[in-house]
């Protein structure tokens, strides 16, 4: 509790953030060469920050959705980012679309486990090692319950 009310810029605040990052790396098996950032707000802010900063409008992008949060990421891609080379891949609520149809050169945004529907991808076999596209993964409902294939995930977001 000694850090409550203290700035994240203070020595104590920085130490607590470093501890949270180090513990996250250890608990989740995040590789040493992966960067970990802590953002204010929720996973919504984190995934939107990743989308806004990592998706290139000149590249093809696929956003896959099978539950409510994935549909929010589609709306962000369509209405906010206005990505011109956008492929939307959806399935009925609670069903998983055929992810093997996503071109490996495309950047891809997906939700690992549907928080609201419970539908989850079983693995990342549909992502080829060394694929060309950037992979942005909303792992909020999966990060502490599923094994993450870090080698295939460029940006993984979650909330505590």
Model-derived features with residue positions:
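Conserved PLP-enzyme active-site core in the AAT-like
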Residues: 44-160
């Amino acid at each position: 509790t000694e850090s409550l009310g203290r700035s994240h810029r203070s020595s104590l605040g920085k130490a607590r953030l470093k501890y949270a990052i180090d513990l996250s790396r250890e608990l989740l098996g995040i590789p040493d060469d992966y960067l970990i950032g802590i953002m204010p707000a929720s996973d919504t802010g984190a995934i939107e920050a990743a989308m806004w900063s990592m998706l290139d409008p000149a590249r093809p992008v696929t956003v896959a959705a099978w539950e409510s949060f994935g549909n929010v990421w589609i709306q962000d891609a369509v209405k906010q980012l206005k990505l011109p080379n956008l492929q939307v891949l959806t399935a009925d609520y609670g069903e998983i679309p055929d992810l093997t149809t996503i071109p490996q050169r495309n950047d891809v945004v997906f939700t690992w486990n549907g928080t609201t529907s419970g539908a989850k991808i079983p693995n990342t076999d549909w992502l080829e090692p060394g694929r060309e596209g950037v992979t942005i993964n909303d792992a909020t409902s999966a990060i502490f319950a599923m094994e993450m294939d870090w080698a295939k995930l460029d940006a993984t977001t979650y909330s505590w």
